[in-house]
């Protein structure tokens, strides 16, 4: 499948290949990856645990892939970081999750004088960054919900081909990004 078509630059950009590695690993071990996604998308389980298990499982699969063939030696990363995982969660549950990009988080936090975290993709710091980011986004969404004029402006820009964004999560992303 075409990563640009499915997620634009969310999963593919310069030197960032989570979509390509996801397809590669899913082709190599489809049941492993299917199981990892089922656990990632299981809302009954805590998000930090799901995040950690998904990353660890992708790393184990990547290692098996790399060892399976000398031609696979360049597969040094699975690229399944906070950004990629936020895309998967947001695509599945768009009314609950937000698209995460570290630079957007840092720049917006700095603009507001909030403390932002160093970029990280592993362990408690990554989980803490995701929780902090989601809290910041929820604060913005709360303000958007109190502003009917902003809501109307946002809805007016969407046509029938657009996701209707009933919870204003994409509008929140626009506010953070721009």
Regions found by a protein language model. Name each.
Residues 84-92, 106:
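Contiguous, well-ordered alpha-helical segments that form the cores/surfaces of helical PPI scaffolds
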Residues 1-78, 94-178:
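An N-terminal alpha-helical hairpin/helix-loop-helix interaction module that forms a charged
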